[in-house]
Amino acid sequence: MPTISKLMVALMATALVMSLAATAAADDSVAIEVRAIAASPDGDEFDSRLDDIEQRLERGFSDYSSFRQIDRHHKTIERDESAEFELPTGDVLVLSYNGRADDFVRLGLQLEDRFSTTLRATPGSTFFQAGLVYDESTLVLAITVE
């Protein structure tokens, strides 16, 4: 019987170590999706590729009635690293992954020399950054932390 007890303790210790290793590995990188959207007060076009965020766009950008996806990028960013996303305006968005804090992903967001901030987002959430002009529309960035 002592052998079974030792085996159980060894199995539990192995499971704990594997769980901690998986948690650490999950903390090493984050997947990000950036969608560039042209928003305009003219027309009523709504791009079906934006159906998953339609209500949030209409609520958050109620002055606009037309939303068209122009570009979409997926990148995985390693901890303490940055990734560049070229925008349709020619500007470059830089996102930095600064690790996790509790249930949040810590990100740095920089739009060349115009804007720089840090934020916390929950995995699976989408946040927006808007203000650049694109082809007589406002460029809205929908940034999803996957």
Where do the language-model regions lie?
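Outer membrane pore-forming secretion/assembly proteins and partners of Gram-negative envelopes
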Residues: 26-146
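Sec/Tat signal peptide C-region and signal peptidase I cleavage site
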Residues: 20-26
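Classical N-terminal targeting signals for secretion and organelle import
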Residues: 2, 19-20
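Bacterial N-terminal signal peptides
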Residues: 9-19
